Amino acid sequence: MTSCGQQSLNVLAVLFSLLFSAVLSAHFRVCEPYTDHKGRYHFGFHCPRLSDNKTFILCCHHNNTVFKYCCNETEFQAVMQANLTASSEGYMHNNYTALLGVWIYGFFVLMLLVLDLLYYSAMNYDICKVYLARWGIQGRWMKQDPRRWGNPARAPRPGQRAPQPQPPPGPLPQAPQAVHTLRGDAHSPPLMTFQSSSA
């Protein structure tokens, strides 16, 4: 594997581990959407909210008759009857299908960004080459090879003679060709005028 490929894998591994740890640490901090005892739907939110104290980082709720709210660790352990220090699996949010959907969606968004970058760099090759050279990223892969892009007028390889053009075999039938001149309007038909009414 090349050093560039190994470096890319290392970066992806670090990003994956950071995202995975963030997901595991955030499951207590999310108040998921819920319906109260009157049947009204309440949207979910992330703790702490902008209006909350920064120590209120956990989601508390007593039952369906009381709204969910952000609370501190002591209140969370009293209300939810969960010991955060004893088990890391205590009050884990279990919406695995939504979490899987977020990961799949994130993967496709990342792939779209990579493809967009590759398309942009292919369309703006000269600009990208200048910036990469300015940043110190250069190499043989940056030089355009006319053979790579399917140039019909290929340059001869070293040690080869240039191919000589050959005349066409025999006379070719001549098709009648129309001759157009721009000198005058002698041969062009007159323009027709149409009456138009404005409505």
From Swiss-Prot:
Glycans are attached at residues 53, 95. It holds the Pfam family Shisa_N. Residues 26-97 are extracellular. Residues 119-199 are cytoplasmic. Residues 146-199 are annotated as: Disordered. One of its GO terms (cellular component) is membrane. Keywords: Glycoprotein, Membrane, Signal, Transmembrane, Transmembrane helix. Residues 1-25 form the signal peptide. Residues 164-174 have a biased composition (Pro residues). This is Protein shisa-like-1. It comes from Homo sapiens.
